[in-house]
């Protein structure tokens, strides 16, 4: 049983997902995301972790024929973000995403962070300047790049590029951030920096992270969900999942007997 005093920020309700091929990748998942907490998704490759994550900002809309069944409700406005009348662009302003590999745009450091603000329609240069600085500080990158904001983003190291992508996601003031294996392409030092940053971001954001690294899930998350073959097998406090899981399937995966 999950123990928390945090309100629910968003939740999936009986969520299923079908790829255009007809494959049912998610099977009736109901799961909360608690406000200003980190939830980790674990499970073997192909279990549906990333598919589930990408439902939250409607990334699947980019490919014709994909189909959602069920709801994802955001609070406090009780908006089902999967409704046809809800603009996916607006959803992605509220729910930002950081991908597995750093994917900076072929632009300057400054323009990478300013991009989302411009898409949103912000034209005031002072406002954009302030938000770029705020986002870079929020991603713990400002001190490293403040004197070369107009350098190409590709000149940054891999770890710096990933923090730049986090800054880009932060610039539009999202309520939720999605991380899809954000450290899998990084070295141990850069990984530690991203994990520390995620812990700091938890003070103002709700975070959902997919990771194949169970030690990482144990280190950074408050809650952990174990998925298998498109189903949610177990969801609980992270300490409970890793020390005393309720389901044998979870225990077998955690202890390396499976997966």
Swiss-Prot record:
Catalytic reaction annotation: phosphate(out) + ATP + H2O = ADP + 2 phosphate(in) + H(+)
InterPro entries: AAA+_ATPase (IPR003593), ABC_transporter-like_ATP-bd (IPR003439), ABC_transporter-like_CS (IPR017871), P-loop_NTPase (IPR027417), PstB-like (IPR005670)
The entry's keywords: ATP-binding, Cell inner membrane, Cell membrane, Membrane, Nucleotide-binding, Phosphate transport, Translocase, Transport
EC number: 7.3.2.1
Positions of the ABC transporter domain: 10-254
Domain of life from the UniProt record: Bacteria
Cross-referenced CDD domains: ABC_PstB_phosphate_transporter
Location relative to the cell: Cell inner membrane
Primary role: Part of the ABC transporter complex PstSACB involved in phosphate import. Responsible for energy coupling to the transport system.
Family indicated by similarity: Belongs to the ABC transporter superfamily. Phosphate importer (TC 3.A.1.7) family.
Name assigned to this protein: Phosphate import ATP-binding protein PstB
Species: Methylobacillus flagellatus (strain ATCC 51484 / DSM 6875 / VKM B-1610 / KT)
Taxonomic lineage of the native organism: Bacteria, Pseudomonadati, Pseudomonadota, Betaproteobacteria, Nitrosomonadales
């Amino acid at each position: 049983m999950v123990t928390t005093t945090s309100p629910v920020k968003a939740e999936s309700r009986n969520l299923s997902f079908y790829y255009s091929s007809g494959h049912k990748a998610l099977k009736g998942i109901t799961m909360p995301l608690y406000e200003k907490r980190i939830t980790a998704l674990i499970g073997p490759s192909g279990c549906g972790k990333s598919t589930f994550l990408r439902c939250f900002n409607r990334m699947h809309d980019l490919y014709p024929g994909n189909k959602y069944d069920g709801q994802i409700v955001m609070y406090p406005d009780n908006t089902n973000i999967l409704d046809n009348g809800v603009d996916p662009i607006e959803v992605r302003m509220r729910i930002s995403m950081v991908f597995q590999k750093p994917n900076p745009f072929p632009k300057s450091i400054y323009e990478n962070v300013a991009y989302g603000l411009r898409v949103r329609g912000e034209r005031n240069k002072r406002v954009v300047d302030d938000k770029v600085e705020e986002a870079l500080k929020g991603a713990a990158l400002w001190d490293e790049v403040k004197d070369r904001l107009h350098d190409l983003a590709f000149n940054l190291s891999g770890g710096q590029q990933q923090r730049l992508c986090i800054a880009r996601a932060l610039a539009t003031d999202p309520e939720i951030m999605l991380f899809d294996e954000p450290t899998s392409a990084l070295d141990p030092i850069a990984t530690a920096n991203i994990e520390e940053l995620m812990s700091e971001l938890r003070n103002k954001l709700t975070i959902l992270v997919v990771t194949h690294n169970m030690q990482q899930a144990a280190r950074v998350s408050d809650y952990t969900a174990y998925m298998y073959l498109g189903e949610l097998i177990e969801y609980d406090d992270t300490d409970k999942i890793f020390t005393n899981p309720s389901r044998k399937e979870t225990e077998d995966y955690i202890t390396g007997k499976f997966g």
